[in-house]
Design a protein with these regions (language model features):
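Nucleotide-activated sugar donor-binding and catalytic core shared by glycosyltransferases
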Residues: 1-249
């Protein structure tokens, strides 16, 4: 028999309630695991209720990832174009958050004319809609897949392919982590901030981080995160954070 391990298991309250609707089926599934390693205390408790016998909680294993070496770093020609830019990212954004970030960009630009905002939407199929939304503010927008359209006047770069986030966290001073200001997603809010935090970024986020409360509380104690409630607060925080450039690794 090959041992079956559930690694870095995370169950949100929403997911747990779904499993409870088919509790007998859930117990049949989860009892097949020889070991479950939970990513947080809440998940550990939910797994116990679902019948898991052997549970360990070592915390979120994403903290153990080595992000010091980023594979496939950004193209040198692109890096040369942005070498004098003040860069921040809006990552894992959801509907409504991109427009909020664009408004903040305009306010920050009054202070730093060389600011570059990089938007990494959670779902890249939304990029064309985001583009139309941002152009309504008369912003110069470029796509990562079409870097020939990127120049010194570009305000916002939209990342329209998956698996690129770490490259941009590596050059950004701070990151707004999305799914935290969309009021329609309060019951299923928040995205994981560990990766940008490990790459030395200040984490800005809205008040709604339900799915990752434990992680945000931990990072807050370390002084890594800051909660903002609207685009004005985001703008003020960005102006403060972008005073100095990100230290080179």
């Amino acid at each position: 028999k090959i041992p079956l391990i559930l690694l870095n298991a995370r169950l949100t309250e929403k997911t747990f309630k779904r499993w409870k609707l088919v509790i007998n089926f859930a117990k049949e599934i989860f009892k097949k695991f020889d070991l479950c390693i939970a990513s947080n205390k809440e998940s550990e408790e939910f797994l116990k209720i679902l019948g898991v016998k052997n549970i360990k909680n070592y915390g979120n294993l994403k903290f153990s990832q080595n992000n010091k070496k980023i594979n496939n770093k950004l193209d040198k020609a692109f890096l040369n174009k942005i070498k004098n830019k003040k860069i921040w990212c809006a990552a894992s954004t959801h509907p409504g958050e991109e427009l909020l970030c664009a408004k903040s960009h305009l306010e920050v630009k009054r202070k730093y004319n060389n600011v570059l905002t990089i938007i990494i939407p959670r779902h890249i199929e939304r990029t064309q809609n985001i583009n139309r939304e941002l152009k309504s503010l008369n912003l110069n927008v470029a796509f990562y897949s079409e870097l020939n359209g990127f120049n010194e006047n570009t305000d916002i770069l939209i990342i329209d392919s998956y698996g690129e986030s770490l490259k941009f966290y590596d050059i950004a001073k701070c990151v707004f982590v999305g799914k935290s200001l969309n009021k329609n997603l309060i019951k299923d809010s928040g995205q994981n901030p560990i990766e940008p935090a490990k790459l030395g970024c200040k984490i800005l986020h809205g008040p709604n981080v339900r799915n990752f409360t434990e992680i945000y509380e931990y990072l807050k104690k370390l002084g890594v995160t800051k909660e903002i409630n609207n685009h004005n607060e985001l703008s003020l925080s960005l102006v403060e954070e972008l005073k100095e450039d990100k230290p080179k690794n």
